[in-house]
Amino acid sequence: EKLNDWWTGGRTFCDQDDPRAVGGYYTQDDIREVVAYAAERHITVIPEIEMPGHSEEVLATYPELSCSGKPYVDADYCIGNEKTFEFLENVLLEVMDLFPSEYIHIGGDEASKNGWRNCPRCKKRMADEHLASVEELQSYMIHRIERFLNDHGRKLIGWDEIIEGGLTPTATVMSWRGEEGAIHAVKAGNAAIMTPGKYCYLDAYQDAPNTQPLAIGGYLTLEKAYSFEPVPDSLSTEEAALIKGVQGNVWTEYMPTPEHTEYMIYPLSLIHI
C-alpha cells in the first residue's frame, strides 16, 4: 500500500514497473509532514539534490543521463546532454514545491569527472561554451542550475568543490575539506558555512575505537571539536560577516538505529548550535 502511494503520489520521475523499486522513500505527504513538524519548532529543512556526482542511483534507473548510457558505470551526470538539465530542473521544481526553504543544496562534491573527458557530448559542450577544463564544465552546470533556482526565488548552496572552475555569483559555499573553501568564498563576496571534516563530522570515532561502535573512520574528540574557531583571524570584518555559521554533519550508514545516531551526535552537536 505504501509503495502504491509512492507510485501514485504525483512524482515526476518514477518507474512504476521497475522491480528494483523496493523502498527507502518518502511520499510527498511524508515530506510535507516533516517540513511542517520542523517549522513548528522553528527549524527549516533544506533539501539536497546531488549533482553532478553521487548520482549512481539515478543513473542506474536513467542511464541515458550518463556519459556511457549504461547503468552502474558512471556516478556523474552527462553535462553535455540537454536531457540532464531537463531532468534536474523538473526534479528541482518538484522539490521546491515540497520545501519552502530559501536555500536548495545541490551537492557539487566528489564528482569524478572521468566520464566527461572522453564523452563526445561533453567535449562538444566544452567547445561550444569555450570551457578549458572539466572543472569549468562542472562550473557551467552549477552556474546554469543557480540561474534556474534564482529565477524561482531560491538560493543555491553547494559543497566547496563548486569553487573549482569558477564560483557562481550568489552561491553559499559549505567548506568541508578544510577552511580554505570558506575563506575563498567570502573573499569573493559569497557567503560560506564552516563544516571542515576534522572538526565537524560527527560520524567519526569519538574515543578509542576498540571501545566504540563501528564507525566510518576518523577521530573527533569533544575537546577537539570545542577547539574549532569558525572565523579565521585573516578575515576582515566584512568578510567575517559572510561566515554564516557552522554545520555539524552526520552520515548514518554506520548507524542502524535512532539510538545509535543520538549516541554519535550528542553532546558534539551542541557545539555547533
Question: How would you label these PLM feature ranges?
Answer:
Residues 1-40, 55-86, 114-134, 139:
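Aromatic- and acidic-residue-enriched carbohydrate-binding clefts of CAZyme catalytic domains
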Residues 45-49, 104-106, 156-158, 173-175, ...:
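Hydrophobic faces of well-ordered beta-strands that scaffold small-molecule active sites
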Residues 271-273:
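Conserved small/polar residues in nucleotide/adenosyl-binding loops
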Residues 241-258:
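Long, C-terminal catalytic modules of enzymes
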Residues 32, 39, 150, 186-187:
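Anion (oxyanion) recognition and catalysis
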Residues 50-54, 109-111, 161-163, 176-178, ...:
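Active-site beta-loop-alpha junctions enriched in small/polar residues
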Residues 68, 73-169, 176-179, 183:
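Active-site neighborhood of glycoside hydrolase catalytic domains
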Residues 186-193, 197-205, 209-210:
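Polar, glycine-rich mid-to-C-terminal structural blocks
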